[in-house]
Amino acid sequence: RMLASDPYVDAATIASLGGEKVSEKSLLAQSDFVAVFMILNEQTRHFLNAERLALMPKHSYLINMARGPVIDEVALIKVLQSKSIAGAALDVFEQEPVAADNPLLTMDNVLLAPHSLCWTDECFDHIAREGLGCLAAFAKGERPLSVVKP
């Protein structure tokens, strides 16, 4: 069962994609996995705050594929430390670059991944060219142009 909450998409459109439109509170309270996809603006900054995170079941996981500041990171750290939710998968942080002492970096119930914003043919062409260039530089013992910092 896929639940969705979006103020800009009607129930029929969501149903045509295999989902069921519900309120944000219902979505948070009923979901095993909450995947976040939203733009960052003044209305969405800290959208997932302590109050909303508290609605999530203890066995649930939060997956943020939006922007870091849509989640109140201090509140997220608290719910993860207290095991109020099972875990989180993040590829963005509220403050970037992320501080070396950020607790999210060392938590066993957090999965971290590099962030990739772009999803267009042009972007993939660029990624392929840049990736091959980095591999070639590495093979020659040179430092690649793009290095993901740990």
Language-model regions, residue ranges each:
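Rossmann-like adenosine-cofactor binding region
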Residues: 7-103
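Residues at the starts of beta-strands that form the adenosine-phosphate
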Residues: 1
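Conserved SAM-binding motif I beta-strand of class I
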Residues: 4
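C-terminal helix-to-coil terminal segments
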Residues: 94-150
